[in-house]
Structures are given as structure tokens and as C-alpha cells.
Amino acid sequence: MIKIIFINTLRRVRFAPSPTGPLHIGGLRTALFNYLIAKKTGGSFILRIEDTDKKREVAGAEKYIVDELNWCGIFPDESPGTKGAFGPYRQSERNHVYSDEIKKLVDSGHAYYAFDSEEELASCRSECEKRGETFIYNYESRHALKNSLSMSKAEVADLLKKGKAYVVRFLVPKNKNIRTADIIRGESNINSSLLDDKVLMKADGTPTYHFANVVDDHLMKITHVIRGEEWLPSLALHVLLYEAFGWEKPIFAHLPLILNPNGKGKLSKRSGEKGGFPVFPIDWSGDTKLKGFREAGILPEGLVNYLATLGWSPEEGREVLNLGKLTELFLLENVVSSAANFDFEKLKWYNHKHIQTTDSSKLAELLKSLNKNAGEIVKEKLVDAVTLVKERANTISDLWGLASYLFFDPASFDEKSLKKVSKDGLEKIVSEIISQCKKRESASNFVEGLKYWGDETGIGAGQIMMTTRVILTGGLTGVGAVSYTHLTLPPKA
């Protein structure tokens, strides 16, 4: 098991999403862990947009990525929208950089031109399949194919002069032991003969992910590459690329997967739809409308706190932490390799805790933005209501469910609660409620008056208050009698 001893040096990390659609919480957690490791050492968090595949790019996706990071309080130090010494920060604007670097690899003999057409490669695959084999473009097959390794320099020069289409492939060495090191998963070894000669530069002159990724990480002086587990199979190739260039490798860390609640399969949009919960931080309004955690009433503090626990936990055992405290306590070495199950109920628990510590005025503003009816309420009254009910709310949306009866007549009445109300004395109770409304001095005076009348008539204070609560709330749950009376009854005439 590899053991990397860190010194408290500044770290440059990057989050490098592709704008191919909305970024779900797996990507957000990757961004969060990168951000935490940078801020813990006073380093830099870079947002780099990997948009070389224009065919898959989705309009609005880059803005969505920036918006969700900002909502969570994760602000890049360097990005397409900020100035930085290592830009541009969109890969589509860095083709001149990749052209220079690919030439260096070709000139040093670590990469070569391949002129095979798609049809010719398809034919090779078909022939191999007939023999029960798998076609791999590598040390065994490359010299029988159309490339600068199997042709003379004159033939290659002639094809290039004529404008023959080509790709640039990486020359993977034969039978070399590749040692990879990962903070989370330790050391591993792989034989290079298992790898194919990956395309580094496509026929249209754009780089592939692997090439652009390594070049940018080096030129942007990235010290730690923290990314998802799905990139583990690419690690050996990336190590070879660093060695071919003669560059120092960054420290790698591959984060564990986030699984469905039942532990079966990677968390996805479909699993969220089936489970009735979002998997995206904020609403996505592309061709397909997708609901976000923000619009479901989750606070960014609650979401960030929960995501931090998916694969990591603080040594001191504390659970409820804001972004500042997470930054202070986070240790990349404590991230585990085992996958984490997504638990929406646990997320709501974290959200509940953060609602308790959030100013009621801020909660009221958020509630107004999410609920049309709440938007019609005078803010001061809504703040008072939120203060009364927030102890029982798991989401911002819950606040309205708990407080709406304070401003509107109940839309329905709970059947079990109605059965506990005395039908015989109901008319008398309602009449007395109206009478007490007219002559009360205060909310507490109103409640005491009703209790006194209940004792005097023999109906009983308990039955009086139960009936009053059902009339006002539609059920037997709610805030204290004095509180809801103060908020629900109109001013004394």
C-alpha cells in the first residue's frame, strides 16, 4: 500500500467537466473534494471546460456547471470566466497548444501518424472476429497497418503533402511494467502489452481526452488529479504519457462511486426518477426538464455537507459541518475506496440540521422563491411563521406545509382528527371562538379566555383547544396555541 506523506504546500487542483449535459451530484462531489483540498492549503481550484467533442456538447451546459458550483459556494480561482496565468481554460481554445505538444511526441518517437481509414479498420475487426479474436491496434498489429512505422519516410512525406487524412497514435512500449500510484487505492502494476496505441490527435486536428487532459494538467501546473473511479482504467496510459514527455507526474486520487440507494448500480438520472428524488443540484431546463435539489427545498449547505460524507468522514466524528469547517477538517488520505450508497433520507437529515441554524429571514426569502402562495405573504409575518415551524422542517418546501394554515384556510381536514372533535358542542365552541376574537386583548388572553369558558361550561379546556386547533389547522399537529393564535387571528377591531 502506497503511503504519501504530505507537507503543507500549496496545491493546484482542477475540476474538468465536459459540457455534454447537466452535471449530477457525482460530478459535484468531485468538484467539492478538489475545492476542499485546495482551500485547506491556500492553493488554487481551477475550473477547466473539456469541450473538444463538439458533437456531444449541449447548449447551456457550461453555464449550468458554473451556476451549480456558485450555488454551493464553490468558486473557482481560475476558470473561463476569470483571469488566470494558465488559460485559456476551455480546451476548444487551446488547439495551438496541443498541436505544438503532439509534434514533440512525434519528433521524439513516442507517437506516429496512422493513415488507416475507418473502413480498413472495420475490415480488420471483422477478420479478427471470424477467427474468434479481438482486434487491437498495438505492437502486434501496427507494422501490418498503414502508418508511419510501417512506411518509409518518403511515403509518409508524400501522403502528408497530398493531405491524406490521418490520426496520431501513441506508441505504447512492448512488455513494460507500468507502476501506478493512487492516494486512495495504493500501488498497482500493469503490463503495457495489454494496452492499445490510443489515438491522441483525431483526423480533424482536435485532441482526444487523454492527450489534452495530460497536456493541460502539466501546463497548468496541477499538483493533484482528483477524479472519479471511472477514470482508473486510463491511469496507466496517462502515466506513460507523462513519462514520454519527461514530465513529473501529479499525485492521483480516484474517488469511489456513488451508488443507488439499494447499492445496485451507479446513481443515475433514471434511479432518481424511480426513487422520487433529484440527482442534479439545480433545475435543468434543456430539452428534458430535470428537477434539482435546490428546487426541492434542499439548502446548498445541506447538500454540500452530505456529499462530503460520501466516501469521507472527519476524524473527530462530527457530522454537521459548514463549508469552512469541512475545509479545515478534510483529509484526502481519509477518503475510502469503497462505494457509497446515496440516501435521500440522510440528505434530508443533514438539511434539517442546517435549516435549524439558518436565519429565519433567509429561509423566508427562499420559501417565497419556491412557493407562489408564500410569495404573497408579508415577509415579517412569514419570518415569524418560519421561526415557529423550522424545527420540524426537513426541506424549505416543508416550511410551507407546516405553516400554510397560519395564512390560509385548511384545504382539507384530517379524518382521524375530526373524530376526536365533539360534534355536540361544535356550534357552541365556534360561537365562543368568534366571541373571544372580538374581545381579546392578546393571543394569550384569547387562549386563556377559551380555556376558562370551557371549564365553566363543562366542555373542558382540552376539548376546546383541540377543536380550535382542528378548525384553524385542519388537524391536531402544529405550533403552540398562543403562537398560532397570534399569527392567524386578525387584529382586534
Please place each PLM-identified region on the residue numbering.
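Amphipathic alpha-helical/coiled-coil segments positioned at domain termini
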Residues: 459-466, 471-484
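A conserved active-site cap/scaffold subdomain adjacent to cofactor or substrate pockets
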Residues: 289-371
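Short alpha-helical scaffolding segments that buttress acidic/His motifs in well-ordered protein cores
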Residues: 307, 351, 386-389, 393, ...
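Active-site cores that bind ATP or allylic diphosphates and position pyrophosphate for catalysis
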Residues: 113, 117-270, 278, 289, ...
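Structural motif
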Residues: 293-301, 337-343, 376-384, 455-463, ...
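Conserved small/polar residues in nucleotide/adenosyl-binding loops
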Residues: 485-493
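N-terminal Rossmann-like or analogous alpha/beta NTP/dinucleotide-binding catalytic cores
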Residues: 6-133, 233-244, 302
